[in-house]
Amino acid sequence: MAKVEQNEGLVEKLVAVDRVAKVVKGGRIFSFTALTVVGDGNGRVGFGRGKAREVPAAISKALEAARRNMITVDLAGTTLQHPVNARHGASRVYMQPASEGTGVIAGGAMRAVLEAAGVHNVLAKCYGSTNAANVVNATFKGLRDMTSPEKVAAKRGKSVEEIQG
């Protein structure tokens, strides 16, 4: 489902295109919304939504929004730092680090975000609503909340060995 393009060293993925309708006195006015994910494959990732009367315009607006809304994710090599739970609306996501060679085991919208971020080994599951926009939002919340042991140790004023036990 995700369409992939390379541009400026960024991986651009089209996650979803939906037709929406505005009902007016004279009938319905149709337009399109696009959801895209952009990442450098090295810990920077962003998502955006665009809306226009035609699909290509909606996609270009969404890609522009995604480039503006990029975040940096602390990765542990090619996987996550620790297991993460997050939710947005009725969508709940669970992501956990996986050993080398596992691959990205995740569903549609989550897979696009994780691959764009540069995660190569992860186990992920989506619960509740599988609405693409909510799943992408929940995945971003989880990735944003993830912290490295070094940051936790610095915040607590302890060594990394004390934190990890």
From Swiss-Prot:
It comes from the Bacteria. One of its GO terms (biological process) is translation. Coiled coil: none annotated. PROSITE patterns: RIBOSOMAL_S5, S5_DSRBD. GO terms for molecular function: rRNA binding; structural constituent of ribosome. One of its GO terms (cellular component) is small ribosomal subunit. Keywords: Ribonucleoprotein, Ribosomal protein, RNA-binding, rRNA-binding. InterPro entries: Ribosomal_Su5_D2-typ_SF, Ribosomal_uS5, Ribosomal_uS5_bac-type, Ribosomal_uS5_C, Ribosomal_uS5_N, Ribosomal_uS5_N_CS, Ribsml_uS5_D2-typ_fold_subgr. Residues 10-73 form the S5 DRBM domain. It holds the Pfam family Ribosomal_S5. The N-terminal domain interacts with the head of the 30S subunit; the C-terminal domain interacts with the body and contacts protein S4. The interaction surface between S4 and S5 is involved in control of translational fidelity. Part of the 30S ribosomal subunit. Contacts proteins S4 and S8. With S4 and S12 plays an important role in translational accuracy. Belongs to the universal ribosomal protein uS5 family. This is Small ribosomal subunit protein uS5. The lineage of its organism: Bacteria, Pseudomonadati, Pseudomonadota, Gammaproteobacteria, Moraxellales.
